[in-house]
């Protein structure tokens, strides 16, 4: 046993469970690639100020959860707690918004880090797939992203998730609501820290998950009652487009999410099988974020879906993903000449796209066949001195148990035909 263990709140992805995570990532990415989204990858750490400005200085993410550190050169950096700010920074730095058609549509996948109290569904290191559409203010774009996320989940076989939808208004109508909410919050029995948060960003209080706080928020003013005509019309079009696409959703007037940059459309995907950590993903529109981090006005929208929580949701529903075997053919050599010849055949099989593995370590027939069984291979190729003297190998169908002799020079073509 190793002296070292994974740090608290983190995990290692190892086979066979890692295959589930790869399948989830691919299921989320596939409809994005099919809808004009290009892949982007950003560093695992950024300037602290990027997140302080973008995510919000009063958010729990920035004040309590960020892994921040100072380099030997004096730079203040942080492990990325979310993906949107990094992707927008990269797009601005590369001038993608000047290169051609808007919106710039990007998708990404990676690990993110937050210093949180570890529990099921909430880790200090977690995996997400995200999508961002940068540089266009269009209800159809908001609807597109919600529909694509719904499509991703359903392609995995997930059914018992809900989509919560709200509008946070814009810079014209939200200040009026903000003032009304602050007046309401000042009359509640809240602790000093929460009252301070209410003065900086009162919407953060609506996102407080503590039961004693939520009980007092029953009569809080609702943002939908303060939306200006433009925001009402925008939100109604998003709702109509989603409905026309056959995607079900629930209006949630108290949905604000945990990041300060959201404007207008905000949404969350929740699964009741996950207990208190019910959100499996979410996103929204962030029309002012580009300007917050020093860029031009670029209205944008995006989401991030949690790979870890999606896997947990699938398990909660009892969904078994159809995962292809990592090995289709397993070669078992008996003797040095067979070892040389079968190793060459395994290499040929791989070149023509057949997943093949080899019995390494000079194990006997019994031990090698155990490995073949464990590999999940459909076929096993066995060869000994007598077989090679006759110019054949033994091809065994691991499902039926049927075994046939096939010419050494024909085995690759035979397996190609069988695996088709």
UniProtKB/Swiss-Prot annotation:
NCBIfam families: hisS (TIGR00442). PROSITE patterns: AA_TRNA_LIGASE_II (PS50862). The lineage of its organism: Bacteria, Bacillati, Actinomycetota, Actinomycetes, Kitasatosporales. It comes from the Bacteria. The keyword Cytoplasm applies. GO terms for molecular function: ATP binding; histidine-tRNA ligase activity. One of its GO terms (biological process) is histidyl-tRNA aminoacylation. The keyword Disulfide bond does not apply. InterPro entries: aa-tRNA-synth_II, aa-tRNA-synth_II/BPL/LPL, Anticodon-bd, Anticodon-bd_dom_sf, His-tRNA-ligase, HisRS-like_core, HisRS/HisZ, HisRS_anticodon. Homodimer. It is found in: Cytoplasm. Gene3D superfamilies: Anticodon-binding domain (3.40.50.800), Bira Bifunctional Protein, Domain 2 (3.30.930.10). It catalyses: tRNA(His) + L-histidine + ATP = L-histidyl-tRNA(His) + AMP + diphosphate + H(+). Its EC number is 6.1.1.21. Keywords: Aminoacyl-tRNA synthetase, ATP-binding, Cytoplasm, Ligase, Nucleotide-binding, Protein biosynthesis. PANTHER family: HISTIDINE--TRNA LIGASE, MITOCHONDRIAL-RELATED (PTHR43707:SF1), HISTIDYL-TRNA SYNTHETASE (PTHR43707). Belongs to the class-II aminoacyl-tRNA synthetase family. This is Histidine--tRNA ligase. Its main location: cytoplasm. GO terms for cellular component: cytoplasm.
